[in-house]
Amino acid sequence: DLSPRFSPDIAVLLNLSPDHLDRHGSMQGYIQAKWQMFENLQPGSTAIIGVDGSDEAALAEIAETYDAIVSVRISGQAEKTAKVFYLEGWLYDQDGPIVDLSAIATLQGAHNGQNAAAAFVAALSAGADREDVIKAFASFQGLAHRMQPVGEIAGDKGHVRFVNDSKATNAEASAH
């Protein structure tokens, strides 16, 4: 929103949440600021939109009306309209399973499933080889302060896992 003429080759919107309303004044203002990136896409550009929320799904429908833009729906919740989605630890596309994310410690959870879906589509859109992208997932080290394992304590009634997610910007993002 600080670069009104920003026109990427690949634009990604994962989700919208009301945690930035102080900056945008309203949810509608926030959505409009995010949508501006898609308005500026040139023919042949790719719009990657998470469709797990109703606002995001509505934006995906709008993006699909732009004939010159390749619009790709992604989901962290196995949304049936998504071209790439996460389900029970696996990343899928319309041809079937892509990669078992549950076997990759740094890519656990539906939120990382959605992140992986976006990365997968973005990389392919940029010309990367499908198998190279799949291999890259296995070597992903994770990001500092983002779901970074700190340690575990085992006890009589189970165990507690400590995770550093200090970059989470709201309570919903940090509740895992």
Name each region found by the language model.
Residues 166-176:
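AMP-binding/adenylate-forming catalytic core of the ANL superfamily
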